[in-house]
Amino acid sequence: MSLYGISVIPVLIWVYLLLGRGRFWHVAAHRPAVLPPAAARRVVVVIPARNEAAVIGAAVASLARQTFSGPIHLIVIDDGSTDATAKAALAAARAAGALPRFELLRGAALPNGWTGKLWALSQGVTAAAELSADYLLFSDADTCHGPTSVASLVADAEANDRDLVSHMVKLSAATPAERLLIPAFVFFFFKLYPPACIADPQRRLAAAAGGCMLMRPKALARAGGLQAIRSHIIDDCALARVVKHSGGRISLRLAEETRSLRRYASFTEIGAMISRTAFAQLRHSYLTLAATLLGLFLTYLLPAVLLFIGDPPLVCLGLAALVLMSLCYLPTVRFYGLSPLWSLCLPVIAIFYTGAVIHSAVQYARGSGGMWKGRVQDA
């Protein structure tokens, strides 16, 4: 293939991404729905926590003060924390007057074959079985819910007959590293998992955002329970997959009022977050890794390279691809309240993500993949 033929590829890719792929780029926050009192449901929230003393209090308080017509019971599983996680969670529940509907569990030792988070969640699900919940809400210890978050999730599930409803929480974009890389993380996630395709029962594609997942207990049981995915490091997408493939209906939306309390002060921290699961996403295939790197080059880097070739037709092709790229990314940039100029940064961002993906593969090869809170979870 000639250089001109190769240079057309990025333009074709971005035309497809703009017009097809479920319009994944059309970012719009899910507006909370008002839940009619007659549709009140019992919700049990399960929060796994390991060394989260800095954020667990705010997470518990946000759930204890929900505007919701049904009962909400909170279960926090302290997964071997060495800090004051348990004390902070208990203090927050007490301050919110939620102790009668709050339970703190000390996590049992991690058995072989389980990831830490899924083992903690499993213990919470076992405890929740005694409460006859209509819905289980899996929430991360660093997720701060908006006041109508639970009502919105339940209303979504009831109105649209969903077995699993997931809201991707709004991630922090305060530091320079976050502003450059975090909106792109959301953009890439939705490009891989377009919400319209996730919600379509005729498609097998499935995904969820682990920070905020509401599901019916019967759907979880039908899918084989958490034991069915016990070793999966990308547990949220694995859970969505077994629920959907067992006949469940799922949906994935973007939340605005519910946000993550986790901050990434440096590029190193964000790189570690990405590389923790990147190679697992590729199913530990070096062939898929090579194809992914080629795809990243053709999609994001080649358009920028073409600007410096000096050949007018090639420059025009590169410019066309960059314009389409920016148009796709712009709604995500706006959602995070950033200048539209950030939409021009995807080629630079792609270089960083390429490095993180390679680093993830190297970590896996060294037997230290999926490092999280002192645990190697992908080796």
Model segments located where?
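Acidic donor-binding/catalytic loop of UDP-sugar-dependent glycosyltransferases
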Residues: 84, 139-156
